[in-house]
């Protein structure tokens, strides 16, 4: 027994600890990662298919002739549409089919908002059709008759006339400055024996203008300058057909 080796308890404890560590199963970090990703995918699919992913707000800008509801309908986007199913390009193509829309930009705002920015063709006038007004656009298209008294955009009113002359006039109206265009209240096609393109304009300032379709926009450039020469409160006829001048109508009445 003298040669027997005595092992102290404190010497054996570290060996037992190391043995326990070796027996402990390793943590599978990759498996945990896969499970986490799978869990997130399941959550996403549930959200994607649930009403929670539906559009909550649709904002429309720049529309005059179409209501917000009509824009939404034509775009194909509703409050029942999932945000993730909205394709901005497809919505834009749908809206560009409308004759009044010149350009459109659809933006998605995560998580559930849509912005629709519209640019309409400029309204250059209203055609008086049996007492009802039809907007005439710069692209030459006319819209449906407006409800009585509703004028979304300030523009002149005129009676329909020859299509050929109408196209010429539209081309000239596009060249007018917005200020001059807003000054025109009514345009009448009044051909004469010497000028089949003669026009009579009734201005919002109360004056009458005699002019012609040829170079109409260029002739109208003189209108603001002539206004400065007319005495306030007096009625005048402004002639822009050949020369550029005006005459007071109340002087003729006195004679």
Curated annotation (Swiss-Prot):
Subcellular location: Cell membrane
Ranges facing Cytoplasmic side: 1-30
Stretches of the chain found on the membrane's Extracellular side: 52-255
One Pfam assignment: POTRA_1
Keyword set includes Cell cycle: yes
Transmembrane segments: 31-51
POTRA domain mapped to chain residues: 53-121
Annotated protein name in UniProt: Cell division protein DivIB
The organism of origin for this protein: Bacillus cytotoxicus (strain DSM 22905 / CIP 110041 / 391-98 / NVH 391-98)
């Amino acid at each position: 027994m003298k040669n027997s080796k005595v092992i102290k308890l404190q010497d054996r404890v570290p060996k037992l600890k190391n043995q326990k560590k070796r027996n402990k199963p390793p943590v599978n970090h990759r498996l945990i990662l896969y499970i986490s990703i799978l869990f997130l995918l399941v959550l996403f699919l549930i959200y994607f298919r649930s009403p929670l992913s539906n559009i909550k707000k649709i904002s429309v800008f720049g529309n005059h002739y179409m209501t917000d509801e009509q824009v939404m309908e034509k775009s194909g986007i509703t409050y029942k549409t999932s945000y993730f199913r909205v394709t901005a390009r497809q919505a834009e193509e749908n809206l560009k089919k409308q004759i009044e829309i010149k350009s459109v930009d659809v933006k998605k705002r995560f998580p559930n908002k849509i912005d629709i920015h519209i640019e309409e063709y400029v309204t250059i006038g209203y055609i008086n059709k049996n007492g009802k007004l039809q907007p005439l656009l710069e692209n030459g298209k006319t819209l449906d008759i407006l409800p009585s008294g509703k004028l979304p955009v300030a523009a002149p009113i005129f009676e329909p006339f020859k299509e050929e002359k109408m196209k010429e006039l539209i081309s000239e109206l596009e060249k007018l400055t917005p200020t001059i265009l807003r000054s025109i209240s009514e345009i009448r096609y009044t051909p004469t024996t010497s000028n089949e393109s003669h026009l009579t304009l009734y201005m919002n300032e109360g004056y009458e203008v005699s002019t012609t379709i040829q170079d109409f926009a260029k002739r109208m450039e003189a209108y603001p300058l002539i206004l400065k020469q007319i005495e306030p409160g007096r009625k005048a006829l402004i002639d822009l057909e050949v020369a550029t001048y005006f005459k007071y109508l109340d002087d003729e009445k006195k004679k």
